[in-house]
Amino acid sequence: MTAADWRRTLNPQEQREVRELVGAATEFDAVAPVGEQVLRELGHDRTEHLLIRGSVSGGAADAVVGYLNLTPPRDAQPQMAELVVHPRARRRGIGSALARAALAKTGAANRFWAHGTLEPARATAAALGLSPVRELMQMRRSLRDLPDSVPAVPGVRIRTYAGPADDAELLRVNNAAFAYHPEQGGWTDVELAERRAEPWFDPAGLFLAFGDDDSDRPGRLLGFHWTKVHLDQPGLGEVYVVGVDPCAQGRGLGQALTAVGIEWLARRLGAGDSAADPTVMLYVEADNVAAVRTYQRLGFTTYSVDTAYAVPPAAN
């Protein structure tokens, strides 16, 4: 096993190896070990990359067996680390070595995502003295037997994304709705452009709600629902982002937008086909009680939980 090697950039071969590593872990654990943003960052120098090379049992003698991605500090938010170890290179201390290297680099100020909160991640966190500081719930429901009608919101019209002319308002509402959020807040044209470039992006699945009853700012954007169809998982759609302008909250707009998007996903994924069994998923902060209750009313139940771990403040 090689020593941990920090990089600002990865060459194309290393990027392929990391993607193969993530794919192997996803297949073995039935949950992706890192978020989609980590994969998006592989070709950029905006985050730091940590590689460990070694042998894979029954396979290559010099492969990337461990990888960690570390975000830079941003707006007083702690740095976030996400890591993965090859299934056939586990129980060698690779995960602990990656985590210790990140803690040493940040002065123990970073957090670690444990996607799916699997037992090996819990054990590693406990061994390193880390405690849960954040939980992100994945909720799911069948796209069959949806409510017959979408709740209407007076004075609001909903249409789909019409192109870059909508971007300024979309960014305004997103950043107002998620001002507190470490991943979703603070978006710029760069974040929008990257997501439009994703193969799953479909403007017909991005719904915008405009207000028609505001005399000062007629037609302003009040909220949006961005859906996603998982091309690598047939039959799976996602409530990717639902954002409502804080000035428009309390009107049922979030529930209405969610319902509109879910209906579209049901049609898109063939819920009317007796042979199909499509599902919709979403992520929500576990402590966002209002949002969790809204999704429960729409028929969602908890599927899995991602946990962020960190050194307890008293020990930091």
From Swiss-Prot:
Keywords from the named record: Acyltransferase, Repeat, Transferase
Pfam families noted in UniProt: Acetyltransf_1
Gene3D superfamilies xref list: 3.40.630.30
Binding site for acetyl-CoA 2: 242-244, 249-255, 288-293
EC number, as in UniProt: 2.3.1.189
Catalysis: reaction(s): 1D-myo-inositol 2-(L-cysteinylamino)-2-deoxy-alpha-D-glucopyranoside + acetyl-CoA = mycothiol + CoA + H(+)
Domain N-acetyltransferase, chain residue ranges per copy: 16-153, 156-316
Record-linked SUPFAM superfamilies: Acyl-CoA N-acyltransferases (Nat)
GO molecular function: mycothiol synthase activity; protein-N-terminal-alanine acetyltransferase activity
InterPro entries in the record: Acyl_CoA_acyltransferase, GNAT_dom, MshD_Acetyltransferase, Mycothiol_AcTrfase
Positions annotated to bind 1D-myo-inositol 2-(L-cysteinylamino)-2-deoxy-alpha-D-glucopyranoside: E36, E183, K228, E238, Y283
Example GO BP: mycothiol biosynthetic process
Residues the record lists as binding acetyl-CoA 1: L83, V84, V85, R91, R92, G93, I94, G95, S96
Function in brief: Catalyzes the transfer of acetyl from acetyl-CoA to desacetylmycothiol (Cys-GlcN-Ins) to form mycothiol.
Subunit structure and binding partners: Monomer.
UniProt similarity note: Belongs to the acetyltransferase family. MshD subfamily.
Protein name in the entry: Mycothiol acetyltransferase
Lineage, highest ranks first: Bacteria, Bacillati, Actinomycetota, Actinomycetes, Mycobacteriales
